[in-house]
Each structure stands twice: as structure tokens, then as C-alpha cells.
């Protein structure tokens, strides 16, 4: 046999072995086929193979069928079928199945709302170390079944122990405000906020910033630390964090006054739904502060702030309409500002109406 032919045979054998190895690595079980189909959006094929897996006793297949029917992926939404498959999965100790089952009982989807059934399903998932199920138990005991504050704290704590940021954040709020029958302690609040912030919860970072800024952390005021936490909160799309940074730069509080940076932070916050930040942008446009003076943009931003419930924005907007001789709109918006609790808006409303 020539060397050339031998090389061809060796190469062929190598590639055959490689393909066989790769094929062997690929999961060709019903569940494996279903998962690959699901990833590429072929939901009908995925459902078919998840069902085969479920019928073979693979609990994850049952859970995935529940998800498909709950969300209407490749089929119409069918909460009753979702409930059936989640129940089967949960009976087989599948924590995601128990979580899904708890959610349907919690919301009353595909069945009558039943908090006890929801508690049972979530509790099983929580024991199986499913963080969100622990958190949802906290929510039920906190907000839906009154008189169970101690249970709420227990389950929020479990979710926090499993690194669920919002569980840690809620405990931080509880200790800061003295909610859920815990003894008020800013020191404990900081501990929980710190963990939640490290887990990238923007609300917790903002809360830390406020505590350090105001010296309420049972520590000395530390503006640099406060600023750092507010920056992180803003980077995590927390509108209050961005708004606080905007105020710092606008007033030159703890930082060098910088109207342009203030405007940029207010814009970020406004775009994320901070009513007061929209109103502050309106003021900056009305004064030509860091941006060219533009009364049209001032009016638009005051309107955004007012629409989102900022009484100062409503007051300023009404004043602009009054100056434009539009008494009807001025009255309507002063009325809104008055209802939002601004005394001066109420006084101006009385003057314009004459009563």
C-alpha cells in the first residue's frame, strides 16, 4: 500500500472518529432535541419532544411544556394545561415546576386564586433553593395575607441568602423604616442594602447613597461614598439616583457646580420616568441654563413632569399658559397642581376662577 493511500485512509478514519465523537457529545434524548428546537423558536417541535420527555418521567420536560402553554409559545395560551404540567413537574420535585404552579395559584390563572395552594408550591420550591419562590412567599405573607410579618421577613431573608437582590433590598427598607414589625436600624438597613447593591439592585444603591449623604447610616456623613453609590444607581437605570446626581451638579453640592452635567443627569432620569427631573429640564430650558433658551422645549418638559405627577411642573406649566393668554389651560393645570398638593397652585386657581 502506498504512503499516499495510507494517509488518505488515516485522515478518513480520523474525521470519522471525530464526527462520531461529536455526535456522541450531542444530547439526542427527547429533552435534548426539544431544547435545541426551543432555542431556535421551533415551538411545535419543542412541545412535541418536551411531551415525550415528560411522558418518560423527565420532570424538566413537563415544566417546559407548562411554560409553553402559559406563554402561548407556538400555541394559544392555555393556563389549565400549564397548571397540569407544572403540577406533574412539581410532584417530581422540579423546583421550576413548583414555581410555575405557585404562580398560577397566586394569580388565579387556569384555576381559582388560592393563596394556600400557592404557598404550598412556592414553599416546596423554596426548600429546593429557588430564590424567587422564597421571595414570592415573602410577598404573600407581607401584602396578601395580613398578620404574618414574621413569616414575610423569614422568606425575604431566605431569598436574600440565595442572592436575590430584591429580597435583600426589601429587608433594607424594612429595617430603615421599621416596617414588618422589625426594630428600626439604619445599621442593619445598610448591611442589606450593601448586599443588594453588590447584586446590582439600583434601588439599593440609591438608598445607600441617600443614607450616606444624609449621615443616616449610623456612620459619619461620607459624601464621596454617597456619590459613588448614586453613580452606580444611575448606571443601573435607577431614575432617583440620576436625579440626585443632577441636583448635586445643579446646586454644586459636594461637587463642583456643572449645569451641563446636571442637565445630562436630569435627562437620563426624565427618560426613565422621573417627573421632577423632567420639570427641572423645563426650568433649564426656560432659563437657557446649560442649553439654549427654548420656551417650546421648556413647555414640553414641564408638561412631561406634570403628566407624571410633579406639582412643580404643573405649576410652572400653568404659569406658561397664563403668560400665553391661555386662561383655560392655565386653570385646568393649576387645578391639577392644586390636587397634587401645591398650595400656591390652589391660590392661583382661586384668583383665575374668581372663587
Place the predicted regions along the sequence by residue.
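Short helix-capping/linker turns of helical repeat alpha-solenoids
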Residues: 37-38, 42, 55-58, 71-73, ...
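Structural motif corresponding to the intra-repeat A-B loop/turn of tetratricopeptide repeats
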Residues: 40, 76, 112, 144-146, ...
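Terminal, low-structured helical/coil segments at or just beyond the last alpha-helical repeat
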Residues: 27, 336-355
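Hydrophobic face of amphipathic alpha-helices that form TPR/SEL1-like repeat modules
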Residues: 30-37, 64-71, 100-107, 136-143, ...
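N-terminal leader/linker segments that initiate helical-solenoid repeat arrays
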Residues: 20-44, 48-49
Amino acid at each position: 500500500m502506498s504512503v499516499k493511500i495510507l494517509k488518505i485512509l488515516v485522515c478518513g478514519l480520523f474525521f470519522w472518529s471525530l464526527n462520531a465523537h461529536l455526535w456522541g457529545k450531542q444530547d439526542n434524548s427527547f429533552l435534548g432535541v426539544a431544547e435545541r428546537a426551543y432555542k431556535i423558536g421551533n415551538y411545535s417541535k419543542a412541545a412535541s419532544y418536551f411531551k415525550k420527555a415528560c411522558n418518560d418521567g423527565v420532570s424538566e420536560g413537563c415544566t417546559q411544556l407548562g411554560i409553553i402553554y402559559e406563554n402561548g409559545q407556538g400555541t394559544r395560551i392555555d393556563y389549565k394545561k400549564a397548571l397540569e404540567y407544572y403540577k406533574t413537574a412539581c410532584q417530581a420535585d422540579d423546583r421550576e415546576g413548583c414555581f410555575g404552579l405557585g404562580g398560577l395559584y397566586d394569580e388565579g390563572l387556569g384555576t381559582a386564586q388560592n393563596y394556600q395552594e400557592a404557598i404550598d408550591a412556592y414553599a416546596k420550591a423554596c426548600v429546593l433553593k429557588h430564590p424567587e419562590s422564597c421571595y414570592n412567599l415573602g410577598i404573600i405573607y407581607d401584602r396578601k395575607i395580613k398578620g404574618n410579618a414574621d413569616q414575610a421577613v423569614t422568606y425575604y431573608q431566605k431569598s436574600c441568602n440565595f442572592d436575590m437582590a430584591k429580597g435583600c433590598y426589601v429587608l433594607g427598607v424594612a429595617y430603615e423604616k421599621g416596617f414588618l414589625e422589625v426594630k428600626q436600624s439604619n445599621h442593619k438597613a445598610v448591611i442589606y442594602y450593601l448586599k443588594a447593591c453588590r447584586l446590582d439592585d439600583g434601588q439599593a444603591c440609591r438608598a445607600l447613597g441617600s443614607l450616606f449623604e444624609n449621615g443616616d447610616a449610623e456612620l459619619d456623613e461620607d459624601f464621596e461614598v454617597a456619590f459613588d453609590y448614586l453613580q452606580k444607581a444611575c448606571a443601573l437605570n435607577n431614575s432617583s439616583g440620576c436625579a440626585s446626581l443632577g441636583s448635586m451638579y445643579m446646586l454644586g453640592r459636594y461637587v463642583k457646580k456643572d449645569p451641563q452635567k446636571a442637565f445630562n443627569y436630569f435627562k437620563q432620569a426624565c427618560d426613565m420616568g422621573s417627573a421632577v427631573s423632567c420639570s427641572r429640564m423645563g426650568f433649564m430650558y426656560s432659563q437657557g441654563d446649560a442649553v439654549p433658551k427654548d420656551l417650546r422645549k421648556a413647555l414640553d418638559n414641564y408638561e412631561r413632569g406634570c403628566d407624571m405627577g410633579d406639582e412643580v411642573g404643573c405649576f410652572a406649566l400653568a404659569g406658561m399658559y397664563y403668560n400665553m393668554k391661555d386662561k383655560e389651560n392655565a386653570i385646568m393645570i393649576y387645578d391639577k397642581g392644586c390636587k397634587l398638593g401645591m398650595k400656591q397652585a390652589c391660590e392661583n386657581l382661586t384668583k383665575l376662577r374668581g372663587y
